[in-house]
Amino acid sequence: MDVVTKVSGEVTAHPSLRTPVTTYGRQVRYTVYEFEELLDSSSINAKGWAEIAQTVFQNYELFDGFVILHGTDSLAYTCSALSFMLQNLGKPVVLTGSQAPMLELQNDATDNLLGSLVVAGHFMIPEVCLYFNNKLFRGNRTTKVAASDFAAFNAPNCPPLAVTTSMRTNVNWDMVHRPTSLEHFSIQTNLDTAHVACLRIFPGIKPEMVDAVLRLEGLRGLVLETFGAGNAPSGQDNAMINVLASAIQRGIVIVNVTQCKFSE
């Protein structure tokens, strides 16, 4: 039996499981812990991310790595959030899911789960990663690119950290993050995502539309998705620029990002 500490501090016992013998001649020993309240991934928010981060923190000294099973709809968002919440990480945290459930005859769940366990159990990759369709991606570089295809995720501006073949897992060690200092692992769970909005610029958008978003009650930040290298329509008499300038003067933080998948 293995012990797992809940966020509340309660210690619970769980069966100790093992994978089949891997290509490396070893088994990965693991235990399964399930949250008391299961959540559809499309409904996750900062509270759910905090619960995951706190669970990793409570059990950090008990395990050599962590595999987190997660629905695919918001999987890339959770990976990105955890990569900033889990600070000074010194162990692998691998998130995965599936496009088809394990009970289906044709599914990707088994390969994704076993592949994640092999990565977390054999390789010291101290990052929050996403494992899917035999590829290991840096968590905060991934995005979902397919609604039903097994190759559901990609990282357009970052090569995979590892690729699994029928023989072994090939790690691109030059890409793996290596800590430059020995700091104690900690978590940051003080998130305020509820007061940040995203707005995608499109041809013909009116400054009044942008202004309406920027005047939402309690808004503190806006991620503005613009054309190309950061371009947006200025509007008649620079109306769009005036709307953005007014919001900045009111203390709203505006971040300009490109809509393009690839950039320098």
Language model regions located:
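Short beta-strand segments
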Residues: I68-H70, V94-G97, C129-N133, R200, ...
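C-terminal non-catalytic interaction/assembly regions of soluble proteins
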Residues: L224-E264
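Internal gly/pro-rich beta-alpha loop/helix module
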Residues: L95-R168
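Accessory alpha-helical/coil subdomains and C-terminal extensions
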Residues: M1-Y24, R138-Q236
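Short acidic, glycine-rich surface-loop motifs adjacent to enzyme active sites
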Residues: Y60-L75, E217-N231
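ATP/NTP phosphate-donor binding region
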Residues: M1-Q58, F262
